[in-house]
């Protein structure tokens, strides 16, 4: 029989191995910051990756995370705070969630194209220098059950609510994307 400590240790080793396998590259799009080559919890650009509540540094195990369990007005912007920023916690100090301003720069200065990669629809975002990242759709339509839009958290809280701002694109969003 395995002891609880052995089980915990083997789970920690598994998580460590998975992190090492799935470590994104930093892609220079010619903007003020570099962007990850794929999502947290993904293994390649077309993988959706893990779902997160805003300000929680580990993936959600309860399905679609819409609202954070923390008061956004209390903690403020979470960029780089490993207690709240999943990118910093999982990938290290050189990684963090983008701010509203950085997402706005991505929106304003890049070319956005609808693409299908490995059978997954999303947006190919090409920077001024010609490098690109792929953002797969991660939200399903209630009517069709198909993935039809992408919602990506920013580090910036939406003051006066229990949520944060996100970069949205696809169905029911202003083209090519919007911060909401």
Predicted regions and their residues:
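C-terminal, surface-exposed recognition/capping segments
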Residues: 8, 23, 28-180
């Amino acid at each position: 029989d395995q002891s609880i400590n052995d089980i915990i240790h083997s789970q920690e080793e598994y998580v460590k191995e998975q992190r090492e396998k799935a470590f994104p590259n930093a892609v220079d799009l010619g903007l003020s910051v570099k962007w990850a080559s794929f999502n947290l919890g993904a293994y390649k650009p077309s993988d959706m990756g893990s779902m997160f509540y805003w300000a929680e540094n580990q993936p959600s195990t309860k399905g679609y995370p819409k609202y954070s369990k923390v008061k956004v007005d209390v903690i403020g912007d979470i960029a780089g705070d490993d207690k709240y920023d999943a990118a910093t916690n999982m990938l290290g100090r050189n990684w963090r969630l983008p701010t509203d301003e950085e997402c706005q720069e991505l929106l304003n200065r890049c070319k956005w194209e609808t693409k299908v990669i490995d059978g997954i629809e999303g947006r190919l975002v090409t920077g001024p220098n010609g490098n690109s990242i792929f953002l797969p759709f991660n939200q399903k339509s209630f009517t069709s059950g198909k993935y039809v839009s992408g919602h990506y958290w920013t580090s910036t809280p939406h003051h006066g609510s229990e949520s944060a701002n996100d970069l949205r694109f696809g169905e029911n969003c202003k083209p090519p994307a919007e911060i909401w």
